[in-house]
């Protein structure tokens, strides 16, 4: 199985999920065939799986625009990155307050073709 360079890619920015949670789900489908990955993500019950599946479907649509055969595609890379972080205040007893971080993420999916 020889692998060529990256054929197509798709991405999504500022998604309301932490990079840590997305990375757990991305590990399930990294370096897998596209057909296997879509089934895995469809039956995974985590919210992050739905977010990654949308980006993967976008990358598959980009591959179809180039006339590539979907059966020969695999996920070469899934990059999960940090995006912006909103800081919020959570009031505590005796006039104190804690800071709460609302984290956002970026996803990039790169597909390669199996020759």
From Swiss-Prot:
One of its GO terms (molecular function) is rRNA binding. It comes from the Bacteria. The keyword Ribonucleoprotein applies. Keywords: Ribonucleoprotein, Ribosomal protein, RNA-binding, rRNA-binding. GO terms for cellular component: cytosolic large ribosomal subunit. One of its GO terms (biological process) is translation. Belongs to the universal ribosomal protein uL22 family. This protein binds specifically to 23S rRNA; its binding is stimulated by other ribosomal proteins, e.g. L4, L17, and L20. It is important during the early stages of 50S assembly. It makes multiple contacts with different domains of the 23S rRNA in the assembled 50S subunit and ribosome. The globular domain of the protein is located near the polypeptide exit tunnel on the outside of the subunit, while an extended beta-hairpin is found that lines the wall of the exit tunnel in the center of the 70S ribosome. HAMAP family: Ribosomal_uL22_B. Part of the 50S ribosomal subunit. This is Large ribosomal subunit protein uL22. It comes from Wolbachia sp. subsp. Drosophila simulans (strain wRi). The gene is rplV.
